[in-house]
A protein has these predicted regions:
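Acidic/polar loop patches that form or flank catalytic/metal-binding clefts of enzymes
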Residues: 5, 312-318, 396-398
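Short beta-strand-centered segment that lines the nucleotide-binding/catalytic pocket of NTP-utilizing
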Residues: 290-292
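ATP-dependent helicase/translocase motor core
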Residues: 2-287, 296, 300-312, 332-336, ...
């Protein structure tokens, strides 16, 4: 499933019409094969026109991977699925490309129509917008143009759902997350690097690496974080994405390993998204535990994790007491737990009694541990004890010590 070029979608009316068609096709049974009425669709249009890209991001998180719009029909509320983020590269997902779209005239005296270069639609919704320049111009001209369009209010209606921008002059290509014009910052413009750390600058190479399916859909779902404190949309950088993919691939093979990082590399966000994605992507994992040393569990890390999780589809529990940890480990919910190595040790050494129900439940949990600053948070002896206790555990350690750099190990 790749992109279909839709030459026929050039204005707002055609864009909404296309979205309506896809929505109705994907919800035939719920709609009882009766198309949405004008008033029903007016409600949908209103719900999909967001005040900010961040608000759109909150809505696009959905419920258990599904993004809904709710329509009242008689006495019944219809919960229509707009997008299913579990159907990446298949299922109900529809991928389309439009270009030369005529953007809104914001004032009667707009001298000329603004024409957008290229936009990628998922299920009829603009999600990634691309501005292209020729080689004589800098990609920064594309950035400034997008900033101007945002300031002019061009990204509204269905276009208010954009999550990611791409700018290129064919030989230099960058991406950044959608934000208000006053919040856009040059320092968040990011180039792509491949797994071997080589820059990917050419726009066609960038498209193959980042904008094909499933990668493009994953960029705006799996690799986007909503920071509730700052009310900002954040898209991970390439090295963060490669680290998360490596963890996912290792866990599918039942392997553990280390992730090497440098100071200031966005480790908190990488570790959050990695811990979260393991839970979302690997159905066999029942709990993911972000394990940290008591000295390192500062308020900043806890607050950052909570801020990222506030708009996410999973619960993050930071456990203040060992009793709370036991309760979380035995509650049967698939969730992400943030706790300290000391509490985990106390739980298995002093609190759990062999033969009890909670002992059996916790011992047999299929759990993935993500360890922060693993070179000092968990000694080899501690890890051995924890591994001996848990029958089914995987381990991923973040470290800034190059000597421990591994791709994966048993």
């Amino acid at each position: 499933s790749q992109w279909t070029y839709r030459q026929d979608i050039r204005n707002e009316e055609q864009l909404w019409k296309n979205f309506k068609y896809i929505l109705e096709q994907n919800n035939k049974a719920k709609l009882n094969d009766t198309p949405l009425s004008e008033s029903e669709f007016a409600k949908v249009k209103n719900d999909l026109s967001h005040a900010s890209f961040y608000d759109a991001g909150k809505w696009l998180v959905g419920e258990n991977g599904k993004v809904y719009v709710h329509v009242q029909r008689g006495n019944e509320t219809l919960h229509l699925v707009v997008m299913n983020n579990e159907h990446i590269a298949g299922g109900t997902s529809v991928y389309e490309v439009i270009n030369q779209y005529q953007a809104f005239k914001t004032e009667e005296n707009d001298e000329r129509d603004r024409r957008f270069d290229v936009t990628l639609l998922i299920n009829g919704i603009p999600m990634i917008h691309i501005e292209l320049k020729n080689k004589e111009h800098s990609y920064m001209d594309g950035y400034r143009q997008i900033k101007k369009y945002i300031a002019e209010g061009k990204f509204r209606g269905l276009f208010s759902n954009i999550q990611m921008f791409v700018v290129s002059n064919a030989v230099d290509t960058k991406y950044f997350s959608a934000a208000r014009d006053t919040e856009l910052n040059k320092k968040f413009i990011t180039g792509w690097i491949d797994e071997k750390n080589y820059p990917v600058c050419d726009y066609m190479d960038f498209a193959k690496a980042v904008l094909k399916i499933p990668e493009a859909h994953e960029m705006v779902t799996k690799y986007t974080v909503l920071d509730n404190d700052k009310k900002k949309l954040l898209i991970l950088r390439p090295y963060q994405i490669h680290a998360i993919k490596a963890m996912r691939n290792a866990s599918k093979q039942g392997k553990s390993g280390f992730i090497w990082h440098t100071t200031g590399s966005g480790k908190t966000m990488t570790s959050y998204k990695a811990t979260r994605n393991l839970l979302m992507d690997i159905p066999s994992i029942e709990k993911t535990v972000f394990l940290i040393d008591r000295k390192d569990l500062d308020m900043q890390t806890k607050m950052a994790f909570q801020s990222y999780a506030d708009n996410d589809t999973i619960d993050v529990d930071d456990t203040d007491y060992v009793d709370t940890l036991i309760k979380r480990m035995t509650d049967g919910n698939r969730q992400m737990i943030v706790t300290t190595r000391q509490k985990m040790q106390t739980m298995i050494s002093n609190r759990l009694k062999e033969g009890t129900k909670e002992y059996q439940i916790i011992k047999n949990l299929r759990v993935a541990f993500v360890v922060d600053e693993c070179h000092r948070a968990v000694t080899p002896e501690t890890k051995r004890k924890l591994e001996q206790f848990f029958n089914n555990s995987l381990w991923y350690g973040f470290t800034d010590r190059k000597s421990t750099r591994l791709n994966s190990s048993h």
